[in-house]
Amino acid sequence: MELNVKTLEGKDAGKVSLSDEIFGLDPRQDILARMVRWQLAKKQQGTHKTKNRSEVSRTGAKMYKQKGTGRARHHSARAPQFRGGGKAHGPVVRSHAHDLPKKVRALALRHALSAKLKAEELIIVDQLVASEAKTKALLGSFASLGLTNALVIGGAELDGNFKLAAQNIPNVDVLPVQGINVYDILRRGKLVLSKAAVEALEERFK
């Protein structure tokens, strides 16, 4: 399929041919959901921790004698039922990451790209280059493209001026093509790809 190419100023710059195997799939929500869950689980810190009965700072002595008091039998005050005691089955430091096959991850990226094209939220620009690192000038360019919430994907190397100008714009993320991922694609409204990014993606999935 073919899609119009725009300049940063919003003018026409020809057409580009997109592979149906990457941009023409029927998006599957289950695959996208699995991928987002995998990304967020991998990102989660997992530093949560509570002290159990062997870790709390408290005497380990028996509270009172076993028999003769008429009260319930107890050992130390570290037990979970007492105030200041250890937590029973509390959270521990661990990794929340889980496995997801590499083929499923690759498929999810293609489905995310297809979903953006199907929703008419994909914009192809000829190049992501700024003459100077001025946020105001880049905001004007984005306004001409109708961008207020977007993920912008450039080639393997980002233009320094463009990167600096864009990093102060709210709700706009800029990544090189090797950093493209399903979660960032879905969390932003529009997806902007440079022609270099399209070529790199088609080479990657060849």
UniProtKB/Swiss-Prot annotation:
Which keywords has UniProt assigned to this entry? Ribonucleoprotein, Ribosomal protein, RNA-binding, rRNA-binding
In alphabetical order, the GO MF annotations are:
rRNA binding; structural constituent of ribosome
Query: SUPFAM superfamilies from the entry?
Result: Ribosomal protein L4
Q: Which GO terms describe its biological process?
A: translation
Q: Name one GO cellular component term.
A: ribosome
Bias type Basic residues, positions: 64-77
The residues that cross the membrane are: none
Is the keyword Hydrolase assigned to this protein? no
**For the region Disordered, what residue ranges are annotated?**
42-93
Q: Which family does it belong to?
A: Belongs to the universal ribosomal protein uL4 family.
According to its UniProt entry, what is the function of this protein?
One of the primary rRNA binding proteins, this protein initially binds near the 5'-end of the 23S rRNA. It is important during the early stages of 50S assembly. It makes multiple contacts with different domains of the 23S rRNA in the assembled 50S subunit and ribosome.
Q: How does the annotation summarize its subunit structure?
A: Part of the 50S ribosomal subunit.
What name is this protein filed under? Large ribosomal subunit protein uL4
Q: Which gene encodes it?
A: rplD
